[in-house]
């Protein structure tokens, strides 16, 4: 049904909570794909809490590279880019997400669950699935189909290290009118300021690096990705 791709470091209890809340509310069988770091001091705790089939251990690397490695391993057609801080709060969330993809023959769609935050500047109360206009949607986690991944060659744009992944992907999806906000599914998340978050924010100037990529190269890559996805939509079927 759905594969979760989740790089995780220093948060074994949160990783376990994600698995527990997703499985307690799923209708089908979710595939959990965690990427863990071999230099994480909490690695053994992960191994104690998670089923061995749910994780891969490797060197510390960019979050985007980890997301893409995990997406390549995903067995299910719908793939979710996830963080380890999520608590799944909606019963049959997987069936609800699948239902939205079933409405599109080509399966070119980005589904963005609610994370509990106010959405954009729209002046009406949104209660139903909504194709989002071309304005930012503050939610970091999303689902796409393998047709999307196979068309572009990646789940997370590989020219970023960690930041702007949701911003970039939403921009692509909104330009082709395929960014679907799904308020009927809640993946509760909040910004953390623990050692893991601080490591990403302070290590190797990652924020400024991704800022520069977003500022200098996004226009060319956006245009190319939009064109490729529009070709699939025009043809009426996925790859």
Give names to the regions the model predicted.
Residues 20-30:
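Short, acidic, metal-binding catalytic loop of nucleotide-sugar glycosyltransferases
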Residues 91-110:
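Conserved donor-nucleotide/metal-binding helix-loop-beta segment in metal-dependent transferases, i.e.
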Residues 29-41, 56-57:
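Short beta-strand/loop segment that forms part of the nucleotide-sugar
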Residues 109-135:
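Short beta-strand-to-loop element that shapes/binds the nucleotide-sugar donor at the catalytic cleft/hinge
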Residues 57-74:
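Glycine-rich, basic loop-to-helix element that forms the pyrophosphate-binding segment
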